[in-house]
Curated annotation (Swiss-Prot):
Modified residues (Phosphoserine): 122, 162, 232, 234, 255, 273, 299
Family: Belongs to the FAM53 family.
PANTHER family, per database record: PROTEIN FAM53A-LIKE ISOFORM X1, PROTEIN FAM53C
Composition-biased stretches (Basic and acidic residues): 278-294
Keywords in alphabetical order: Acetylation, Phosphoprotein
Pfam families the record matches: FAM53
Compositionally skewed regions (Polar residues) per UniProt: 201-215
Name assigned to this protein: Protein FAM53C
Natural source organism: Bos taurus
Annotated positions of the N-acetylmethionine modification: 1
């Protein structure tokens, strides 16, 4: 079986495998004239185009549609309705063949966006004209609510007041958010947070009932849902931005405090600009400040600085040269105190000689200790004059 297939494939040539394109026109079976449409299965050569074929106008239905099948796909041809046709046919033809719009009626493209919208990637081009009203943090600049009651309801209690009073009653925007517009008017729902924060005066105020906690709004304020939009934080400088400035009646007692404010900052002075408290202490800026009289530097006493500390060798030589009989305390500890001639008995010359010998031994012993340790002063005591010590 395989050999037969391979032999047949070898006999075929590339010319026999040339592809042909078919164009099929399907007329209605009850149509009499088939010459206009051609044969039901018409073979067209590859070089011929389907656009050159005669147009088949026989596939006409009662709803004024014309169908003709071509290799490029199913094309739908419409003919204008006759004046005697039924209104259903006219309405169908108007739906299927809309009139081309006039160039004068086309909407004017919006102006190029400002730099603020060029920087913000969250604002698309078609919504560049829609500027949200920018409001700062809602805890600082709310105007005081006069009728503030403690209710048992779960929903927010908002006073229902007229628009010209301009107190903080929550109302919808003129172009409210998509989630608030899409909700039906008969079903109550809780208001989204950004619709409360971006509330604006409108002709149809809406209020929240404290018992049920629902959010009611008029059906007239609900319009078809606009495309969703992400809110950008860039403030818009429009004519509506001035109405949300802080009022003169605002006080620290009227506006609620932030719950996350530290306890130490509650006694700071209240100001609109909230200046930084650390501006007066600029650590990075070096300036010439006047010296603080409370922190005076201690004056230098040069007399005390010129006084040399007691050095044993020098003082010993100086006292020896001056002929004074005062010996240093550490030398007194090394050797017994010498007895002068006035203290010794008159007839005891032998005792005086023996004491002088002890002085010599004590001085030599002290010189050896000073040479070995050199802890009291770094001076060489090898050149000490022992005769002066003996005379002393």
């Amino acid at each position: 079986m395989i050999t037969l297939i391979t032999e047949q494939l070898q006999k075929q040539t590339l010319d026999e495998l040339k592809c042909t394109r078919f164009s099929i026109s399907l007329p209605l079976p009850d149509h009499a004239d088939i010459s206009n449409c051609g044969n039901p299965f018409q073979l067209v050569s590859e070089g011929a185009s389907w656009r050159g074929l005669p147009h088949c106008s026989c596939a006409e239905f009662q709803d004024s549609l014309n169908l003709s099948y071509h290799p490029s796909g199913l094309s739908l041809h419409l003919r204008p309705p006759s004046p005697g046709s039924s209104p259903q046919e006219q309405s169908l033809s108007q739906v299927l063949s809309p009139e081309p719009p006039d160039p004068e009626k086309l909407p004017v493209p919006p102006a190029p966006p400002s730099k603020r919208h060029c920087r913000s990637l969250s604002v698309p081009v078609d919504l560049s004209r829609w500027q949200p009203v920018w409001r700062p943090a809602p805890s600082k600049l709310w105007t005081p609510i006069k009728h503030r009651g403690s209710g048992g309801g779960g929903g927010p209690q908002v006073p229902h007041q007229s628009p010209p009073k301009r107190v903080s009653s929550l109302r919808f925007l003129q172009a409210p958010s998509a989630s608030s517009q899409c909700a039906p008017a008969h079903r109550p729902y809780s208001p989204p947070f950004f619709s409360l924060a971006l509330a604006q005066d409108s002709s149809h105020p809406s209020a929240a009932s404290p018992q049920s906690g629902s959010w009611e709004s008029d059906a007239e304020s609900l319009s078809p849902c606009p495309p969703q939009r992400r809110f950008s934080l860039s403030p818009s400088l429009g004519p509506q931005a001035s109405r949300f400035l802080p009022s003169a009646r605002s006080s620290p007692a009227s506006s609620p405090e932030l719950p996350w404010r530290p306890r130490g900052l509650r006694n700071l002075p209240r100001s609109r600009s909230q200046p930084c408290d650390l501006d007066a202490r600029k650590a990075g800026v070096k300036r010439r400040h006047e010296e603080d009289p409370r922190r005076l530097r201690p004056s230098l006493d040069f007399d005390k600085m010129n006084q040399k500390p007691y050095s044993g060798g020098l003082c010993l030589q100086e006292t020896a040269r001056e002929g004074s009989s005062i010996s240093p305390p550490w030398f007194m500890a090394c050797s017994p105190p010498p007895l002068s001639a006035s203290c010794s008995p008159i007839g005891g010359s032998s005792q005086v000689l023996s004491e002088s010998e002890e002085e010599e031994e004590g001085a030599v012993r002290w010189g050896r200790q000073a040479l070995s340790k050199r802890t009291l002063c770094q001076q060489d005591f090898g050149d000490l004059d022992l005769n002066l010590i003996e005379e002393n």
